């Protein structure tokens, strides 16, 4: 059995993975190495289990989005809360919740408000699928508490407020009793155990939630069987302690992804953790080299596995006469004016080219800023008016003019600025995409994974693990002045685009499915003779 411990942690509170209301989401691409690995083992029918340390009441929706619902889950908090292991998903509707008589509901584009006799009773927040995440209960316009719903149809916890700030959180047993009470003040994050549940814990109180999680995780890890089970840990500061809680005779894999686990030669604890693992997996040559700096012996057991998103399929862009360019925009470094002007000049020159400027949960202010920059460039450069769709000027007689008011209100350009809120939206957009452009100092990791997974060539300013120059992409070694050459290389001729597609397919086959599992198991045998 392969036990995978992911790093799906919260930012403010590490042991919390609570879903965010859709209108709050910011830069929340969820895909990572654990998702990639578990999908591969799932598709191959290998025995695997997700071992989860974190509190995650909306876990099933997350697993559904990542195509992982077929994988078994062992959850520390499910055990603590007495949730039956066979309990299925059950979406909660407004009518399932008890409301006082005469309660009315007001629906806004963002959430639902419950009122009674003109006073606010509750605010109901939903996720991207419309599933209810939380109920915020009010009294005299002040928050009493916030209830977190589990996606299996029950109230999982409550956060109580004092002086308009979170005071403590109660984690509820499946039958409704509170089990743990976690203080949320600046002075203390201690955890109290309900006297009725002392039997289930080793202590009556804990310094923090990490101590509770450590106790319960250790109980699970000590049940792993020598010679049968493998523990695959996502490298993350919160996960490293679990290596030491696992019997030394159990095979362990430590998986590095992006910059999730800082690598420093002075981090001796990490060094000993890496010694304890039989296999080290990385997603990049850069990380592999950084591990080698610690010790040559570590380099010998370090292997790179490129991650792919198997939800992406080879797209249908070749079925369109237009060529869509997917231009990733990092909101922390918007494209320069010269870069934008160059893109618009290319659009003006090639009538069948289209561009989608793509933010990932970007702030509305930054999205608007980019839109304004594009509008200003078009207004200031006469030739850039050619970026309008042909349909807007075709069919006009010599003496006809386009209605200026209409033109001002609804310009029909061959570019659009989009702000994507989920990976599924990105995947859908890429189905018709012919080329990806990312001019960031460090290209977006998920965009690169998605591009190669869909067989789409990519244009970048720097060399990366996912893009090889003139094979499945173009690296602008001479700067932005090569941008037109790079774009036309793949969009004006079919041969380079087809070669990039074939190259991507070969890379995918090398690091997915049965071939990857054989490599993985072969590396383990090398370490154990």
Where in the sequence are the language-model features?
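Conserved acidic donor-binding segment of nucleotide-sugar-dependent glycosyltransferases
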Residues: 473-481, 489-495
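Acidic donor-binding loop of glycosyltransferase active sites
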Residues: 426-443
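Short hydrophobic beta-strand element within catalytic cores of glycosyltransferases
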Residues: 457-460
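Conserved catalytic-core segment of nucleotide-activated headgroup transferases in glycan assembly
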Residues: 310-398
């Amino acid at each position: 059995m392969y036990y995978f411990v992911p790093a799906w942690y919260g930012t403010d509170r590490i042991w919390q993975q609570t879903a965010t209301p859709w209108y709050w989401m910011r830069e929340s691409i969820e895909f990572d190495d654990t998702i990639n690995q578990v999908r591969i083992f799932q598709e191959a029918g290998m025995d695997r289990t997700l071992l989860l340390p974190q509190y995650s009441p909306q876990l099933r929706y997350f697993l559904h989005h990542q195509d992982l619902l077929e994988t078994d889950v062992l959850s520390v908090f499910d055990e603590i809360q007495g949730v039956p292991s066979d309990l299925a998903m059950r979406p909660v509707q407004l009518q399932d919740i008890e409301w006082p008589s005469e309660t009315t509901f007001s629906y806004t584009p963002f959430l639902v408000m419950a009122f009674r006799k003109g006073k606010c009773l509750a605010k109901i927040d939903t996720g991207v699928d419309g599933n209810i995440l939380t109920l915020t209960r009010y009294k005299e316009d002040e928050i009493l508490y916030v209830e977190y719903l589990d996606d299996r149809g029950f109230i999982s916890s409550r956060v109580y407020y004092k002086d308009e700030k979170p005071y403590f959180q109660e984690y509820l047993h499946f039958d409704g009793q509170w089990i743990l009470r976690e203080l949320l003040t600046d002075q203390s994050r201690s955890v109290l155990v309900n006297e009725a549940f002392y039997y289930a814990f080793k202590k009556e109180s804990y310094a923090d939630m990490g101590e509770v999680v450590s106790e319960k995780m250790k109980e699970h890890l000590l049940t792993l069987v020598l010679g049968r089970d493998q523990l695959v840990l996502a490298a993350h500061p919160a996960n490293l302690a679990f290596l030491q809680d696992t019997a030394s005779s159990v095979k362990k894999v430590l998986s590095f992804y992006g910059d999730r686990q800082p690598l420093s030669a002075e981090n001796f604890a990490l060094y000993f953790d890496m010694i304890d693992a039989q296999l080290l997996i990385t997603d990049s040559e850069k990380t592999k080299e950084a591990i080698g700096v610690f010790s040559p012996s570590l380099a010998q057991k370090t292997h790179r596995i490129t991650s792919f998103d198997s939800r992406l399929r080879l797209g249908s862009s070749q079925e369109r006469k237009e060529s869509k360019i997917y231009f990733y925009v990092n909101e922390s470094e918007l494209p320069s004016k010269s870069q934008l002007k160059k893109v618009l000049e290319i659009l003006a020159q090639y009538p069948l080219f289209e561009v989608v400027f793509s933010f990932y949960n970007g702030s509305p202010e930054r999205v608007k800023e980019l839109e304004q920059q594009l509008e200003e460039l078009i207004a200031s450069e006469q030739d850039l008016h050619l970026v309008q769709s042909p349909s807007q000027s075709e069919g006009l007689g010599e003496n006809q003019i386009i209605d200026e008011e209409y033109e001002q209100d609804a310009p029909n350009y061959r570019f659009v600025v989009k702000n994507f809120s989920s990976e599924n939206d990105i995947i859908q957009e890429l189905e018709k995409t012919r080329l990806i452009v990312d001019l960031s100092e460090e290209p977006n990791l998920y965009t690169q994974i998605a591009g190669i997974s869909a067989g789409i060539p990519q244009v970048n300013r720097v060399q990366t693990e996912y893009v090889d120059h003139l094979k499945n992409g173009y690296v602008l070694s001479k700067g932005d002045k090569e941008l037109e050459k790079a774009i036309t290389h793949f969009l004006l001729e079919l041969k380079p685009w087809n070669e990039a597609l074939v190259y991507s397919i070969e890379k995918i086959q090398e690091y997915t499915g049965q071939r990857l599992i054989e490599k993985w198991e072969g590396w383990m045998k090398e370490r154990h003779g």
